């Protein structure tokens, strides 16, 4: 390897919002990384799926555009 080409790695502490911390190496100089999810709290790794509220989106769409019936024309020709 060429000298002075690669960045220096620093020991870094990663802190998740769930409270989990672990140490790794990174090029970030201050040695602290904050993460939103980690393997201890991510639904894929824990097996707990979070249910997303899509009902609110449907209601918002129906308020904006109204509820259409099958066969009803939408708008007229200009």
Curated annotation (Swiss-Prot):
GO terms for cellular component: ribonucleoprotein complex; ribosome. InterPro entries: Ribosomal_bL28/bL31-like_sf, Ribosomal_bL31, Ribosomal_bL31_A, Ribosomal_bL31_sf. Keywords: Metal-binding, Ribonucleoprotein, Ribosomal protein, RNA-binding, rRNA-binding, Zinc. The keyword Isomerase does not apply. It holds the Pfam family Ribosomal_L31. Coiled coil: none annotated. Zn(2+) binds at residues 16, 18, 38, 41. Binds 1 zinc ion per subunit. Its cofactor is Zn(2+). GO terms for biological process: translation. Binds the 23S rRNA. Belongs to the bacterial ribosomal protein bL31 family. Type A subfamily. This is Large ribosomal subunit protein bL31.
